[in-house]
Amino acid sequence: MNDKKVIVLAAGGTGGHLFPAEALAVELRQRGYDVHLITDERARSFVRRFDEEHTHIVSSATFTRCHPFALIKTILSLLKGMGQSLRLFYKLRPVLVGGFGGYPSFPPLFIAVLMRRVTFIHEQNAVMGRANRVLAIFVRAIAGGLLSPKGAYAHKTLLTGNPVREAVLKAAEIPYHSPVGEEPFNFLVFGGSQGASFFSHIVPEAVALLDDQNRKRLRIVQQVRGDAAGLIKIYRDMGVQAEVAPFFDDMAERMAHAHFILSRAGASSVCEIAVIGRPALLIPYPYALDYDQAENAALLARVGGAQIISEKDLSAQKLAALLTQACCAPHLLEKQALAAKKVGQPYATRCLADMAEALIAGRLLSDIKEELFDENAT
């Protein structure tokens, strides 16, 4: 018989929602808890830290502006997910239920609230997502990755930060070195799952506009979602050394060795750039809900840790000018890298686990905030 206390974490079936849940699960297991995951079918290809016994798929759907029948179908799907969550909770008897965003987190968190279980949500972005926005009204505590400590829920918001991978923490130990003279210039480009195709077009156009000296210095590592072979040929024809692939297993290490990064501004990307401490040009994904990527990027830009340009304002000429500036101003790169690292939160996983244990122990939120998180927030 398993005498460990059970904690249930619920997350949408994408990497951005799942990763912080998995990171917390690893930490909580080390502290003696039995941790389960509730998610949807999409997660099967992402989940790495939960076995089948501890992974539970519930029915879920996303609200969209479409036909009334689709709306009815969505509501029925969520109701079904609530029933599945109710049966699971009666079986597991969790002492804590945490949500990490995405609609699959809504049914279990809503049922947990009705069952008077201790609950919290974790919001990775600077702007709260739709599911978390509703759940924020009812849960006991809100853990903020990039959230502002102010607002309607300030009294129950704890600034834990966003958990980062162990590989990122290891990469953060590598000091930043800005290249000088004729030294190679490592340029890392990644766009995540959203909008990487934009970079596949504009980056080679910008590289073609560089002068010969700076172009020869470039060492490009670029993540793409489309024709990797075609992009490799374009760079080869320009005489540029480049690695192009849909995915890099060692992305954290590549970030550590980058001299300049071009990226979208998803919460995990922004936090990893900050923890490792690398200068970056952030292009918020323009179709992100609630413009959360623009707000994420602004947090890093305000302290001088990154530059921001909207996609509509980024031309090949503009990017070429910024690349030229980066190649020729190593002191500015070092200043930006230092500013980014100062706001990194490498201990977010530990902070999140501390919060979870304090909630289980029945501690007052005011005490938790004062004793555990006031120092972390500064």
Swiss-Prot record:
EC identifiers of the protein: 2.4.1.227
Keywords: Cell cycle, Cell division, Cell inner membrane, Cell membrane, Cell shape, Cell wall biogenesis/degradation, Glycosyltransferase, Membrane, Peptidoglycan synthesis, Transferase
Gene Ontology CC annotation, any one: plasma membrane
UniProt keyword Membrane present: yes
Enzyme class: transferase
Main location as per UniProt: membrane
Localization of this protein: Cell inner membrane
Pathway(s) per entry: Cell wall biogenesis; peptidoglycan biosynthesis
GO biological process, one term: cell wall organization
Membrane topology: Peripheral membrane protein
Binding site for UDP-N-acetyl-alpha-D-glucosamine: T14, G15, G16, N125, R165, S193, Q293
One Gene Ontology term of the molecular function aspect: undecaprenyldiphospho-muramoylpentapeptide beta-N-acetylglucosaminyltransferase activity
Membrane among keywords: yes
Catalytic reaction(s) noted: di-trans,octa-cis-undecaprenyl diphospho-N-acetyl-alpha-D-muramoyl-L-alanyl-D-glutamyl-meso-2,6-diaminopimeloyl-D-alanyl-D-alanine + UDP-N-acetyl-alpha-D-glucosamine = di-trans,octa-cis-undecaprenyl diphospho-[N-acetyl-alpha-D-glucosaminyl-(1->4)]-N-acetyl-alpha-D-muramoyl-L-alanyl-D-glutamyl-meso-2,6-diaminopimeloyl-D-alanyl-D-alanine + UDP + H(+)
InterPro entries, per the entry: GlcNAc_MurG, Glyco_trans_28_C, GlycoTrans_28_N
PANTHER family: GLYCOSYLTRANSFERASE (PTHR21015:SF22), UDP-N-ACETYLGLUCOSAMINE--N-ACETYLMURAMYL-(PENTAPEPTIDE) PYROPHOSPHORYL-UNDECAPRENOL N-ACETYLGLUCOSAMINE TRANSFERASE 1 (PTHR21015)
Annotated function: Cell wall formation. Catalyzes the transfer of a GlcNAc subunit on undecaprenyl-pyrophosphoryl-MurNAc-pentapeptide (lipid intermediate I) to form undecaprenyl-pyrophosphoryl-MurNAc-(pentapeptide)GlcNAc (lipid intermediate II).
Family: Belongs to the glycosyltransferase 28 family. MurG subfamily.
Protein's name in the database: UDP-N-acetylglucosamine--N-acetylmuramyl-(pentapeptide) pyrophosphoryl-undecaprenol N-acetylglucosamine transferase
Species in which this protein is naturally found: Bartonella tribocorum (strain CIP 105476 / IBS 506)
